Structures are given as structure tokens and as C-alpha cells.
Amino acid sequence: MAYYTDSSSSESEDFEDVINQVVAEEDITGAAWYDGHLSEEDSPGGKPRPKEQLPKDIVKMDARAYQLEMLEASLKENIICAMDTGSGKTHVAILRIKAELEEMPEGQVVWFLTPTVSLCAQQYAVVKAQIPSVQTKIVTGADKVDSWSSTTWDGALLNVKVIITTPQVLLDALLHGFVNISSLALMVFDEAHHCNKNHAYSRVMKEFYWESKTKHEPVPRILGLTASPVVRSDISSLKRLESTLDAVCRSPTRHREELIANSQRPALFSIIYNPKLQPYAAGFSESLTKLMAARNKLNILEDPYVVSLRAEISDRSRRKLEKAIKEKRTYVQDTMKSFCRRSMEMAKELGAWAADWFISEAIRLFLAGIYRQGASSKSFRDAEVIFLARVFQDANIEPPPPLTTHSGLSEKVQRIIEVLLNYDKDARAICFVKERATTVVLSHILTTHPEVSSKFRIGTMVGTSFVPGVKRDFLDLPETGGSQCLEAFREGRKNMLVATSVLEEGIDVPACNLIICFDKPNNLRAFIQRRGRARMRQSHLYLFVEDEAEADWEALEAQMKLQYEDEKREHERLEAIENSEALDYPEELRVESTGARLTINDAKSHLQHFVSTLASRKFVQTQPDYLIEKVSQGYQPGDQPLLKATVLLPVSVPQALRQVTSSRTWVSEKNACMDAAFQAYKALYEAGLVDDHLLPLRDRLELELEVRPGMREVRGLYNPWLSIAAACTQGDVPLCRRALKVSDGNNSELCEFELAIPVALPEMKPMVVWWDHRAQLTLRIDSDAVMADTDVRHADQTTINQQDHTSVLLSLAYGHRNMTIRDDCILRLVSKSGPLSMEQLGQVEFAPGLVTANGSSYLVRDERDQSRHPYYFESVLPSKPPAESIRKVYRGFDEDPTEATYLSVRKWPKKTGFFHRPCSPQHSPSTKPYAYILPAETTTVDRIPLVYAQMGLLMPSLVCYTELYLVAAELSRKVLAPLRISNVSMLVEAICAKSARTPENYERIEFLGDSILKTCITVNLAATKLHLPEGILSLMKDRLVSNARLCRAACDAELDQFLVTQQLVTKGWQPPYMSDLAKQDQEPESKRILSPKTLADVVEALIGVSFVDGGLPKALECIRLFIPESQPRPFSEVRDILFGAAEPKGMKLPADLQLLEQLIEYSFCEKALLVEAVTHPSYNVSGTVACYDRLEFIGDAILDYIIVEEVFALEPALENWQMHLLRTALVNADILGFLIMEWSYKQMGFEVCRANEGDSDSKSSGDSTSDKASPRLEQTEVPIPLWSFMRQSSAELTMEREITKARFEELRDPILEAMRSGTHYPWALFARLHAQKFYSDFFEALVGAIWVDAGPGFDACRAFVARSGVLPYLKRLLRDQVHVLHPKEELGRLAGRERVEYVVKETLKDDGDGKEWACEVRVGGRYVTDVTGCLFKEESRVKAATQACEILKRK
């Protein structure tokens, strides 16, 4: 029977008028045409693909030991895996499919069979989520497979590796020759107990599998899954099942203890009820009375079917007419009969009120469906629907009054209400019923019951299978949101489901603590399946039984009690065995040096602690697994079997230590496991993973991490002038003479000197100094040095005057100050333009022509001032200007005559020679035209050009600059002598802190050195500690590169005395005079307080200098110099070690990973490296050699190195903060996660579409042949993303990956738009994407694997990073000057000294379905903005910070 959709149209309208306005999309007498109440898989008008609406909560996939055992068994032979519901059969199938895909030849497929469409959708979701790297397809009857051709099948299976279908689909394909049994590599039979009699399962095996096997032709491997292989307690049925499936039934009996621990048993209660109809306040069901009356009033001669037959003139139609009238078998008659019968059953089962609501609701849905979809009176089939609708209208049936009491409810319903209200725990419940309609009606009753609804949030779940071409029964009250309810139940938003037997088996739901069998289970198997849903501790199971059927119930109850008793006896047997065996184990592990010891009693707890310290990654199981094996050797019947235990450690443990067996046999599983744990811990100690205190090595490393002190007292700065003065006092020292040229900002040479100093000067970069915020000067010191034979100290005064103009220059600039000016300055300047003398200062009286004589400018001096202060000359004034026009008047201004010549001058600067451009003056320009006024008659003019005075003023900067090079040269000569660094300029950069305000500081080169250090240490540790897990390697690396360790290295090497931290102070500055230095040499060594980070930064800067000077080899030498215990080896050597350690050698790449090499455009020489790189640490499957942890450890450093090298080499050179921003933007987990999701391979595939799909012309209202038309193939491109190749076995990771995939599909376009053309880096979008770290870990593991395979160079890795999009995005960020600063950091800068507060709250969504985050931003206690609707806490902060930045910048 057909059922129809909901509608809000008025029922009083004429149906023919309504119908004639709508063109029917499908024949309403055919398959269901209503899409409003159908799931996508049920709708024949749509694609039967449960894709977007698949449940997000995937079956738990953490492999337990007994599941791994079942996998091993299935790899050896065909098996039927018999395990309780909820114990993880599906995971065994997933592991088996993965193993098959690795070996499966091209052209074969894995065929996964499930008995129902619901299970097809369930298992499709699981396979798709767990094995996303291959094409997986689901095919059911809804795909119209009965009309598929050979071409259709070939297209549908193109590039498909796993196909999930109902058994009838496969059987039909085999029967018609579209699929050959030899093309199947593996067949998985879900709910394999159905394989009996004439079931499609059985026919596939008997008619095709066994026929081919008998002929010795290839046949697929078999894996059956079941929770109850014995049907109706018939043991012989097990033998038949094994024979039919050519498989042996296997249950993990070797792990019975663990299996029982993972399968909780609920307490069992029976509820006896009276099935008789209960009295109803509104009388016996009024609606049912009206419905039966309407049925009795039907006139068969008015039936549309009869009318249409009477209009035909043929013998066939006459025979049909006679039969229809005689038997009253028409659509209308059958529907009314069924409606009345089912309404009566509803009244008996649930009560009269329930029957009234059922009748009114069914009629409402039927009528509303016609309004929604329409029908045409041109077809007699539509005429039947219109006729039936008018019958319902004429019956005038109204909904019952609201349910306020138990009146009108059956005793059975009243009992379930009592059970629910009396249940005193936080419930997670399933109520099993028999009929589809009962689920809807009972759910409605419980939902509208005030007390029940306050305690339970109730949903429904029914089966969705149907046969295409058969009318759907609207009397089933089709529920609209089964999959949504199931998802809400999984997420905890609903805590009770009313469901049919569809939830008995197969479909994965969370563990429950309350199971209600509203209808008695049909057999023991159904009971076992339902009981398996109650896996929580202290669960309850209620069985409802009619008081008239107690005898039948007692027989079933006896079976169930027997089952319980068997399980209880098993528990008791295990306990008795453990108590009976004496623990005679003399062996112990003792460490003589520490006195530590370990016995068998402590071994399991120690081993558990060791595993928990291996890593702190999410989604990784942190506990050992134990396998129990019965030893058959020497076993006699009747003897207690002897056992051995094998402990399995996580894949991050070296393979040789990962599986350890007990040293002897035991009767008790417990003792065998303790023995295995002891042997395992002993092996770990011998391998060096446990220290001499018998504690995990990680614990000791964490304790040994050096704590960086707050500040540290170190040596004072090395003074090179003291060393030079000491050398000069000991004998003649040759002078180093160099040309010093001074030029302006236009590169015009202003003057030239000879710089003389009694020490060899290294090559010096040009010194750029700023005179003020507008003008700069450049001092170039030629690199070609001329060494004089003698020191001018011993020359006469005339010679000194001729060869040393330093004192004159100082007098020009500083003579008016309190500076002591003498002739014994170590650094001397000699003018190339002729001799300079003190007599030339203020030599002549002022005359206008003298100030700018010979094209030069000269200083003027005030002779009335005892210090003879110098001034810049500006103009001549014929008379004294008013005092109001002068910014500052001199003393005695008012007494001087008005009618006299005056000079307008500017004051000589107190401070200049800045290494960095100073800020422009902040004060507003003065309105007074004259800065200073001097009388012309008391003013004199220098006869030395102004540029020499400027040079004198720059002497502090020149001495400071020279001192930097002398300090660096001494550092190179002493501490860094083994490195033979040729570029002293870079050493100057490396030893200067930012606080010194020198021309350059170490921040840029330290940025490079930091990455070089971590890369060198990382690859060396990985190569020299092959047996250590990544977690321990990370701690060892952190210990070697920590600021505390580097600080200690700096002090141990006496590097601290070469670190420049204080800037040049010109106030009180004195030149380095020989006489003063002789006195200082007698003073004790000075001390200073420095930050340990500053000392550590200098070490990293020197490593960077070494790299620039001599590449990685010299950088390794520098690391060896400062951190001798690291003993770094050349990159070629460590790469060869790592490459040689890859196992197994020469392996063939698994078939499912061959596509990955094409995707990344790199073919591995050692395929084992690629397999290791794609293996997540949760993948604890037998045979796994290693996981990607160690490769990720390497790849993280290599990726950082590649990015740092790229940004460091950019021209023009970037500032340190710019490089930090770019590195942060390019190697964070968010962008790497996004890029690995975006990076995909487009594989060709075909979708099977209806012939009339998308073709409105073929959908005529009366045409019923369109369903028979042949389907068509539509070519598609199936994306296979890079992340899908990661092998993992974690339920939580799979769920997180599926949820992240949905977010990625939502955010992909806006993120790509921002990356391609946005002005800002998409921090907020990435925060919403919230890619977990395993995405970036996978990316980095691939980088590490490529380097080990292709190294020791980085070209292959750099090419991979470029293909990923990281390097192109770097160019885009630079080209378009994208704003990269993180919003939270930017907000902190905009706020200045005001405090920024993020007030984050977790709230319910507006629809009450789930939670979201909101954030309010306050700056300085003031509200700025707020955001809502965020998925994550950090996202709310980032979004709020982004908005706050925009608001503050506008202000």
C-alpha cells in the first residue's frame, strides 16, 4: 500500500482540483514516492546513497587483544567470527579488509554482505570512515539493480575496492553473469547465522562458491560475523553453517577472561501484564467505530478498480471483474480491511486512546501526502487514492483529546510507564517493539506523558528496507528522523529509543543500561542480541510477558537462565584456577648499583606505567594487551590445560621488544600474564628503556631537564682596548693603517682619513650612522691594511701632530664639554686633506664670507662663552631682533645694542651618530623664527670645515663600532678557533643583543641557528638511538637544546664575556686613552647579570653563523664545540644509518599505497619508509613494524628547516619578527591539516542514475513504465585525499576525522578564497576547522620519510613541501603583503598596557541540540565586542579578537 506525505493544506478542498495542479514525479502506486518521510536510501526517486546523512558516531575501533587474535585466525583460514554483540566484530572485519586490500590484485573486489538495507548503510559508513583511501560503494534494491546491464555493473565497479550490498543484489548479479565469483577476493557475511535454508546467503555459497571450488577454480576468502551462530539452540545448525560457508566457527576462547570483562550482563526482570482491552473515558475507540462503519458502507461497484474493469471490453478484464467483485480484493477494500485490523490490534496492544491517535495520524499522513505530491485522475491508480481519501474525509475522524491520565492506555503501556518512572539511574534505554507503527505510537505516548517526558528524551528507529516496485504501507506511520534520532542517541541528546528488531543486531549504538523487550523475543538468538545492548555496569533488562502465555515464557526463561548459569560457572572456574595455583617464581630483576628490584607481583603495574609514559598523543591506547595460548604438548584428556601468555606493547616500542611471552606454562591466566609482564619489563631494562632504578627512561629524563634560572651572574664584557694597551706597553707594536672615507646619503664623499690602530683589524662592513632623523652618513673602512713599522708613540710632537688628528677632531666636536682630550688615544685618525691643529678652532673673527668659504661650511663659536660653544651659522641680521622672536636669548641680551650686526645660529647637537634612525621630533614647530642669536662682534669662525667637526662628533660611534669587531675577532681567535670562521661581520651580528642598539643584532641569525640546531640534534638522535621511541627522543632533544643547557654551554666556553648587551652612551663618554687603560688593567674583573635566554640565543646565533660560513658541516662542528655530549655526525652518515634501519628490506609496496606515491609524486626506494610514514601509533595490528612517530620527529625538524631557510634567504632581508610570523603561519597544525585535506587524487568512477533522473519530460503523470527504464552511467571524479591513506585503529580518531571532514567541506571554499586573494591570514577559519594534530603529524612524517629515503640533501623534501602548497603560499603572503599577525597578539598590541580579557562561556544552541561557545572581549575592563555560535573555545577567542581588532583600529 502506498503512503503519502504531510501537508498543511486544508482537507476541505476538492482533491481533483488540487491533484490536477501538480505533476506527479512518480507513479504513486509503485514504489514509495514520498520524500519527506523517507531516508535518502529509501527514496527510489533519489540516489540511494547514505552519504551526507551518515551517523557521525562510528563503531568503536580500538583493537583489543581478542580482536587481533580473530584477525590472525581469519588470515590463516576461513572463519565465522562468533563474538557477543558490542564486543567488536565489525572491527575484526575492518582489519581483515585492510589486510586483504594490501595484497589484493588489480581487478578484484571485497564484497561485504549484510542482510538488511539498514545494516548496509551502517557498514558502508564504517568502511568509508575506516578505509577512506579506496573507493567504497553501497548497492541495494533501491538502486533498481534488476534493470542493470553488464555495462552498468562494469561502470559501477570501476576502481571500487569494497562494495557493500544485500545478499540478493550479489545473487542476482551472479545469476545474470554480471559478476564472476572469481573476481571476489574476500566475502564478508555480516550476521552470518542467516546463511541457512534458501536464504540468499546460502544460495550464493551453494550455487556459485561451492560450484567453483569443486571445479578447482579461484574462490574468495570467507569471513562470517555473528553474535549467535546457534539458531533455536540447535547445535547441528552450527555444523550446517560451517559447512555452507566453508569456514570454521571461531570464538576468542583464549581471551575468555577479557571478553567476559568487555561484555557486561544485565539483571533480568519479567513484567506480567493482562492483554485485555481497558475501559476508556471517551468510550470504546470512537475513531475505530467510525472507521469500521466507513468500511461497511463501501460499495464494491463504485470502486475505481471495478469501474475501470467494467469500461474495458475483453475476456481478461471480465475475469478480473468477476474475481474482484466476488472476493472484494481491490486496493480500496484491502486498505480498509488492513486499516481496521491494525487499529484493533493497536487498541489491544496500547489502548483505545492509542488506537484513536493511530487512526487520526494515519489518515492525516495519507491526506497530506496527496496535497504534497499530487495525483492525476487520468490514472485509475490515482483514482483509487482519490476515492480512498474521500472515504476518510466522509468518516469525519478527529484526533483524540490530549493524554492527561492513564485512561485509554493498555495495562502493558501502564507497566512500561511504571518501569521508566521507577528507574533511578541516568538512563540510556532501548525499548524493543515488534511493529513499525507501534514505535511511533508508543513513542508519542511516552513523549506526551508529562512525568516520562521530563525524565526521558525519546526517539524512534525502525528498519528502512523495502522492495522496489511495491507500495509502502502508510499504516506504518513512517517515522521521519530515524537516522537523526540514532545520531542524537549516540551523542547523548536523546537517552531512549523505541525501536523495532532493526537495533537487535548489526547497527552500532552506545552501551545501554536499560533494555525493555515490550514484545517477547522470538527466540534465544533475539534475546542474546537484545541483551548484548546492555553493556553498561548494573544494567537492567525487562521482558514483558502476557499472563496467558506464561508457559511459553517459562520455556524461554529456562533457556536464558541456563545461559546465565553457564557464564557464572565460567567466572567461578577462572577464579578457582587462579586461587589454586601457587605462585612459585624465584626469578627477580635486581640492579646492584642502586638496589632496585622487580618481582613478578609488581611487573604488570610497572609495565602499565611504562606504556603510559611512551607518548602523550591523543587517540592512542596506553595499555599492554595480553594473549593467552593453550599449550597442547603433553596434554592429556581430563587435565587442566596449561597456558602461556604473550604481552603486546604499543607499536611505538621497538619491534623486537613489542611481543614477549611468559617463560613457562601456567594453569592460571592471571599468573601467565604476570610472568609475561615480568619478562617484558626485563627486556625493556636490558634494552635501555628502563633505568637502573627500574623506572621508565622518560621519567628520569623529565627529572633531569635543566631548570633555567631567572637571571645569571656572568663575566663582564671583554674590553679589547685593555689587551691592546697591554701589548703596547710590552714593546713596539706595528700600526694597522686603513683608509676611512666619509660620504653622505647621496654617496658623495665628504672627507677621507687614515685610521691607525696598534692591532690587526678584521674586514669591517661600512658603518651607517644617522646624524638626525633626516640625514645619514656612511663611514667606509678599506679592507686593505698597511702595517707601519713602528708605533707613533715614540715619535716627537711634530710627528704626532702630523700623524694623529684625533685630538683636534675631538676638540672640534667636544671641546666645549667636560671631555678630557689627550694625544694618547689608541684609535687615531689622520686627515688626508692636510694637517689639522687646535689653533684652527675659532681662529678668525666673523665675516660673512668666511662661514662658507671654499665651498665648505664652518662652525661659529661664541667667544664670550668660556667653553667657546660651537654653533651652525644660518644668517646675518642687520639689527637685534625682538626677544619675542627668539626661542632662547643669551644672558645680557637686553643690555646689548640694538643697532648692531647679529647672527642667527643653531645649536651644535649634544648627541648624534645613531646606529638606528631616530624618531622625528614629536613637538610642534615653534612660531619664533630664530633659535639662537649671537652678536657678530663676539663670534669667531673655525678654519677647519664643518665635516671634520661632524667626524669628531662621530668618534664615540666609530670607537664603539671598531670595538665590536675587535671583540668578535677575539672571540674567533679564542673560543671559535676550531671553526675558522672567516666572516667576522657575522660574528659581530651574532654577539650583539637587541638591547645594545648596534647596527645589527643576533635575532635574525639566531632564528636560523635555532632551526639548524634542532634539525641537527633531531636527526642525530634518531640515527644514534634507533631503539628509542619518539617520546623519549623528544625529551632527549629538549634537554640538549633547552635554554638552560645552552646557557651553561655559553658560560662553560666563556662565551659570556663576548656578549654585547648595553648600548653606547655618549654622555660622559671618554676615548680609550693609553694612560687610562693602564690604570684599568689593575682593577678586578667586572661582573654583570644577564638573562639565560640571552646567553642561549648567542649560542644559537653562532650556530647560524657557522652554517652561513660553511654550511651544515661547520654548523655541526659548532654544535660539537658547545654541546660536546651530542657528538653530531654528518648528515650523510645519519641518513645512511636511518635508511639502513628501515625494515623490511626491499618490501613490495601494498597495493592500496601505490596510489599514494602517484599523489605525492615521489617514488620511494625503500617502500618500508612509506608504510611507516602512513602508520598512526594506534595501528596495533600484528605485523606492523613501526609507526610514524620517529619519522614525524624527523620531519618536524626538516620542515621547519626548509621554511626557515626560505624566509632567511629572502631579499631584501626580513626582520626577525617578520620571519617568525611567516614561519608560524606556514608550519602550524591548522594550515598543514588543511593542506593535507585539500591534497587529493581524482579517481574516475561511475554513479548509476535512473534513466529519468533529472529529466522532467519523462515524468508523465500516468506513466508507470519509467521505473522499468534502463539506468544510465554518469562519470564522476572521486577524490581520494592524502589523509585517507593514514592507517589507524582508533574509534575516537575515526569519529574526529569524519567530523573534521564535514567541517572541511563547509569551510573549504572560504579558506581557499582567503589563501588565494584575502588580505588577512585566515586564523579564525582555521580555528573553526580545528584540525587535530594527527593531520600535521602525518604531513611531517611524510617529509621525514622522504628525507631518509632521498637525503642527505633537502631537494626532494623541498619539492614535496612546494607541491603541498606551503611554499607557493609563502610567495603569496610576501607578494601581496598579507596581514599575518595573529588576532590575539594584534589585540594585545593595540591594547597597549591595558589588560585584555576573554570571557568565554559554553551555551546551548538555539534549537537546544548541542552546545556552542561564546566569547566577550574586554580591554581595560571595557566591553569591546562579543561573538556567539562557535564550535570551539579557541575559535571563540580568535573570532572575538578579530572583531575587537577591527573595532579598535577604526577608533
From Swiss-Prot:
Keywords, sorted A to Z: Antiviral defense, Antiviral protein, ATP-binding, Helicase, Hydrolase, Magnesium, Manganese, Metal-binding, Nucleotide-binding, Repeat, RNA-binding
Cofactor: Mg(2+); Mn(2+)
Record: residues binding ATP: 83-90
EC number: 3.1.26.-, 3.6.4.-
Dicer dsRNA-binding fold domain location: 603-704
Residues reported to bind Mg(2+): 1192, 1337, 1340
Sequence similarity: Belongs to the helicase family. Dicer subfamily.
Protein name listed in UniProt: Dicer-like protein 2
Lineage, highest ranks first: Eukaryota, Fungi, Dikarya, Ascomycota, Pezizomycotina
Name of the gene: DCL-2
